């Protein structure tokens, strides 16, 4: 019997080994989101040793974040081809090697290639597979699981920032990078526990063709994506798409992608600039580094609390609007705190920012999972991360350039806050429009775009189609179905009989 993933027709276990997977996802998320921000405590030393401006130095974090997001489609393809566990093990080695090599860098370009490209790629190859595996283990408790996993970011941020400051003071930035590279090897341990969820044997209707459980000679599996297709006839061979670009035609996905682009332009800027902003305001180095810890401490509480709140039956259908509210609150926090200069005002900003930032972090992937469904989530996540990469390459470096030119942080906070607030308003308005259009338009049979699985298989050649997702009441609109059912929709289960029928 293959171990590629859960058997069709069986829902996620919502527990068991899933809690171990959740713990690993917690660690990976912490490294992925906390590491690029924590590296900012080394910027002053890098600026001095390389005689560079802040904008040039900030490219290290920006490239790291861009690789984390921009290689999303690559990660999706690798997960579909090789599975979650091998990809995460390779990613952990790459992330560690990048920081170790960066400790020997003599030019900024070498830092860009090592700490930026290699470490960013390694983090990406850990982050996306961990989210995919988390979705395989949790369905009913998925909002809570997402919130708990997302709490890894503030926990690690609150720990890595002071740790980086201590390493910088004791060993210099080179010794600090070397030790942080060793710390990233924990990603390999996280990848090792990412085994596919167990499942029962195939459904009885598939046994009627004469194949016994686990003995089908044409069994094809996708280890990490949790997809398992069995050939019922050697003459018809279903093929799997390594990256499902058809998700781009989905209204819900388009709304989410635009929202994430606007959000990423400004969301990370305050956190990246915060330490140096405080230092320029006369705050001691240790106290300035502790500001990120304050953000992290508040974020730790906000993420699981918001995840549990979003899992309530009455609120879960309205998760997109909660996400919009979180974005709006984050943007308004930046706008109202642009003139903060005293340490007390900066602490108040960190508390408000950590609360809204935690809400965004807890809800962002839950909204995407609910919008596109589990079967298309790997491809959708990869494409969304690619969109975010473009915004990350624009936002923080542009902010750093403005700081160098204007010597003023105030306009940076105004710009960042406006972008994030605009993302929240757009998400709410566009979601409402999609829901209204879906209610007004008659529902048609089949999926949009029209081609059948067998036609796709013949056209793709070397790719194998993902399982068909039955047409729901419009993806984002399908969230409203939750209010009547009290639990999430499972479009992939509805589509399974069709897949079995077409393969005969």
Curated annotation (Swiss-Prot):
Localization (cell): Basolateral cell membrane
Alphabetized GO MF terms: lactate transmembrane transporter activity; monocarboxylic acid transmembrane transporter activity; symporter activity
Gene3D superfamilies associated with the record: MFS general substrate transporter like domains
Stretches in topological domain Extracellular: 36-58, 107-115, 165-172, 276-289, 336-342, 398-410
Catalytic activity: (S)-lactate(in) + H(+)(in) = (S)-lactate(out) + H(+)(out)
Gene Ontology CC annotation, any one: plasma membrane
Skewed-composition ranges (Acidic residues): 453-463
Tissues where this protein is expressed: Retinal pigment epithelium.
InterPro entries in alphabetical order: MCT, MFS, MFS_dom, MFS_trans_sf, Proton-linked_MCT
Cytoplasmic topology ranges: 1-14, 80-85, 137-143, 194-254, 311-318, 364-376, 432-504
Compositionally biased region (Low complexity): 215-224
Superkingdom in the source lineage: Eukaryota
GO BP of this protein: lactate transport
Chain intervals with Basic and acidic residues compositional bias: 204-214, 493-504
Keywords, comma-separated and alphabetical: Cell membrane, Membrane, Symport, Transmembrane, Transmembrane helix, Transport
Membrane topology: Multi-pass membrane protein
Coiled coil residues, start to end: none
Annotated spans, Basolateral sorting signal: 450-484, 485-504
Purpose of the protein: Probable retinal pigment epithelium (RPE)-specific proton-coupled L-lactate transporter. May facilitate transport of lactate and H(+) out of the retina and could therefore play a role in pH and ion homeostasis of the outer retina.
Record-linked NCBIfam families: 2A0113
Domain notes: The two basolateral sorting signals (BSS) are required to direct SLC16A8 to the basolateral membrane.
Similarity field: Belongs to the major facilitator superfamily. Monocarboxylate porter (TC 2.A.1.13) family.
Name assigned to this protein: Monocarboxylate transporter 3
Organism: Homo sapiens (Human)
Gene this protein is translated from: SLC16A8
């Amino acid at each position: 019997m293959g171990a590629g993933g859960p058997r069709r027709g069986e829902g996620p276990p919502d527990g068991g080994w899933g809690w171990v997977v959740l713990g690993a996802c917690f660690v990976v998320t912490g490294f992925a989101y906390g590491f690029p921000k924590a590296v900012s405590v080394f910027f002053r030393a890098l600026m001095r040793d390389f005689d560079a401006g802040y904008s040039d130095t900030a490219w290290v974090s920006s490239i790291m974040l861009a690789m984390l997001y921009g290689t999303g489609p690559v990660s999706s393809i690798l997960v579909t081809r090789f599975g979650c566990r091998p990809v995460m093990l390779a990613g952990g080695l790459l992330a560690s090697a990048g920081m170790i090599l960066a400790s020997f860098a003599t030019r900024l370009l070498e830092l860009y290639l090592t700490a930026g490209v290699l470490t960013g790629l390694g983090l990406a190859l850990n982050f996306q597979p961990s989210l995919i595996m988390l979705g395989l283990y949790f369905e009913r408790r998925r909002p809570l699981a997402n919130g708990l996993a997302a709490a890894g970011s503030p926990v690690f941020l609150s720990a890595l920032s002071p740790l980086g400051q201590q390493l910088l003071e004791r060993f210099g930035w080179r010794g600090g990078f070397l030790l942080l590279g060793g710390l990233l090897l924990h990603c390999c341990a996280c990848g090792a526990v990412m085994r596919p969820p167990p499942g029962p044997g195939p459904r009885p209707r598939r046994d009627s063709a004469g194949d016994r459980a686990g003995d089908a000679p044409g069994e094809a599996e996708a280890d990490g994506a949790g997809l398992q297709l069995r050939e019922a006839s050697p003459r018809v061979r279903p093929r799997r798409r390594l990256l499902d670009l058809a998700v781009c035609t989905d209204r819900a996905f388009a709304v989410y992608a635009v929202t994430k682009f606007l959000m990423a332009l400004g969301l990370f800027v305050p956190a990246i600039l915060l330490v140096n902003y405080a230092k320029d305001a006369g705050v001691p180095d240790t106290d300035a580094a502790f500001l990120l810890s304050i953000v992290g401490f508040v974020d730790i509480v906000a993420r699981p609390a918001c995840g549990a709140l979003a899992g309530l039956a009455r609120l879960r259908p309205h998760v997109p609007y909660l996400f919009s509210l979180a974005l709006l609150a984050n943007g308004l926090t930046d706008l109202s705190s642009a003139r903060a200069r005293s340490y007390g005002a900066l602490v108040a900003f960190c508390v408000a920012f950590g609360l809204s930032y935690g809400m965004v972090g807890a809800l962002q992937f839950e909204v995407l999972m609910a919008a596109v469904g589990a079967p298309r989530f790997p491809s959708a996540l990869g494409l969304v991360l690619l969109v975010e990469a473009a915004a990350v390459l624009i936002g923080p470096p542009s902010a750093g350039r403005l700081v160098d030119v204007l010597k003023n942080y105030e306009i940076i906070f105004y710009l960042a806050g406006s972008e994030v607030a605009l993302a929240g308003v757009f998400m709410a308005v566009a979601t409402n429009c999609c829901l209204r259009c879906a209610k007004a338009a008659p529902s048609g049979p089949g999926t949009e775009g029209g081609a059948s699985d067998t036609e796709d298989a013949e056209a793709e050649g070397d790719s194998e189609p993902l399982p068909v997702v039955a047409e729901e009441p419009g993806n984002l609109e399908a969230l409203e179905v939750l209010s009547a059912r009290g639990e999430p929709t499972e479009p992939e289960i509805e589509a399974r009989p069709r897949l079995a029928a077409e393969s005969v």
